[in-house]
């Protein structure tokens, strides 16, 4: 038997996504056990105060005859609510704040446990995304999944959805590739406005500019044409 947590952005999203995927539709007891965990393995559950149909924790019957315990958490609870426990598995759905991710890693450290994260990189190249994409460390694994990995999506459906999305979001939505920054300056794919490095001809006019930050970082730019 193991001890595990599953967590999302809020108590409501944790209920509507993680609890539903694992146990079945939260507000319909007749479909309980239609998620990833079959009914015969679902034991006693405790309710989460103030959140209708949400579980705080639940007993899962293990094949050995013992009981595993699964707790449901939310990032909005703050890192203090993620402290103190020793766990075997933590599932984080949607990108967690850095302080929640480090708590999850710490909670599983003494048991050699695992931390799973499942999310679309909605926030761009964040600290967490950049580390996994550019500096994968011992014991870490990253897998991207795009629309081509979803056989239920037909080509017509893909085309319709792409047409409805802003151009700068299309790769992020369809391929799981993060946009650079939380919001792009130019709402177009990066390859349209970038080129390979080349030596700038001496006769090209040039401009340099600087913006001294007050409540934001100082920036500088060089322009040639």
Give the ranges of each region predicted by the language model.
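Short, glycine/acidic-enriched loop or turn micro-motifs at the edges of active sites
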Residues: 96-97, 214
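Nucleic-acid-processing active sites and adjacent nucleic-acid-binding tracks
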Residues: 202, 223-225
């Amino acid at each position: 038997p193991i001890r595990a947590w599953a967590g999302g952005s809020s108590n409501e999203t944790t209920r509507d996504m993680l609890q539903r995927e694992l146990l079945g539709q939260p507000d319909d007891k007749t479909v309980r056990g239609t998620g990833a965990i079959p009914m015969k393995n679902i034991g006693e559950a405790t309710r989460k105060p103030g959140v209708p149909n949400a579980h705080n924790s639940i007993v899962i019957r293990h094949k050995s005859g013992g009981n595993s315990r699964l707790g449901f958490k939310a990032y909005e609870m703050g890192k203090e609510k993620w402290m103190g426990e020793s766990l075997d598995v933590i599932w984080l759905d949607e990108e967690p704040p850095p302080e929640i991710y480090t708590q999850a890693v710490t909670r599983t450290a003494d048991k050699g446990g695992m931390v799973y994260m499942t999310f679309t990189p909605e926030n761009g190249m964040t600290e967490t995304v950049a580390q996994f994409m550019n500096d994968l460390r011992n014991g870490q694994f990253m897998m991207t999944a795009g629309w081509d990995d979803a056989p239920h999506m037909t080509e017509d459906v893909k085309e319709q959805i792409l047409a409805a999305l802003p151009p700068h979001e299309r790769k992020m939505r369809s391929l799981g590739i993060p946009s650079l920054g939380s919001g792009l300056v130019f709402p177009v794919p990066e390859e349209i406005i970038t080129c390979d490095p080349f030596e700038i001809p001496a006769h090209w006019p040039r401009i340099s500019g600087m913006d001294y930050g007050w409540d934001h970082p100082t920036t500088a730019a060089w322009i040639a044409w």
